[in-house]
């Protein structure tokens, strides 16, 4: 298997890892701090020498690989909600890629967060609010808003909303990288077995 296939599958796992957290937070109102940090850190690595630099926390990425196997494998337990989020994110990524203005603003706002991290942890509420603001101001404006399902009690909380938007930004970052590495939506239909095999192999590395 080629290195590019491994890297592309890693980026796709990054999308699903972020989506899994969105789903969990929407239903339960809290999140795993390490997994959240791993996803948010991926947004900040904008000029990596390799894909593995973007996903430094390999343990956190395991959930993404497991979801690839569950969603694209031969098992019957497909999660329709995950598929809906994934389709929405990939559609927004296409719109983002066509907007040089949005990409420029995105880069500028991410640099502001880099500066903020000299004073705060990446999972600090203020930092998460800034990640969420980037998603709301730039990405969300590009197309139809993703409708997140979950517990209304948690979804009405500002902190929950901000974590979800921050994680959707992380999913977008991985979607951009996946596309840059040659990922195409048709691969999810016609190359499913190859992607699943690569994910399963990646879980054993």
Swiss-Prot record:
GO terms for cellular component: cytoplasm; plasma membrane. It is found in: Cytoplasm; Cell inner membrane. Pfam families: DUF489. Its main location: cytoplasm. Disulfide bonds: none annotated. It comes from the Bacteria. It is a peripheral membrane protein. InterPro entries: HflD, HflD-like_sf. The keyword Cytoplasm applies. Keywords: Cell inner membrane, Cell membrane, Cytoplasm, Membrane. Belongs to the HflD family. This is High frequency lysogenization protein HflD homolog. It comes from Shewanella piezotolerans (strain WP3 / JCM 13877). The gene is hflD.
């Amino acid at each position: 298997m080629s290195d590019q296939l491994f890297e592309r599958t890693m980026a796709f796992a990054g999308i699903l890892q972020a989506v899994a957290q969105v789903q969990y937070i929407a239903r339960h109102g809290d999140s795993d701090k390490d997994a959240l940090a791993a996803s948010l850190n991926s947004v900040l690595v904008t000029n990596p020498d390799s894909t593995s630099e973007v996903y430094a926390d390999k343990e956190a990425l395991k959930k993404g690989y497991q979801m690839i196997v569950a969603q694209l494998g031969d098992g019957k337990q497909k999660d329709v909600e995950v598929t809906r989020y994934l389709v929405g994110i990939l559609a927004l990524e296409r719109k983002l890629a066509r907007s040089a203005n949005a990409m420029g603003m995105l880069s500028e706002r991410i640099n502001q967060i880099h500066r903020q991290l000299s004073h705060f942890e990446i999972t600090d509420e203020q930092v998460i609010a800034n990640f969420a603001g980037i998603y709301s101001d730039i990405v969300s404006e590009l197309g139809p808003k993703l409708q997140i399902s979950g517990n209304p009690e948690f979804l009405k909380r500002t902190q929950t909303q901000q974590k979800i938007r921050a994680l959707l930004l992380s999913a977008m970052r991985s979607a951009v990288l996946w596309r840059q590495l040659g990922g195409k939506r048709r691969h999810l239909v016609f190359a499913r077995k190859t992607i699943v095999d690569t994910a399963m192999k990646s879980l054993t590395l």
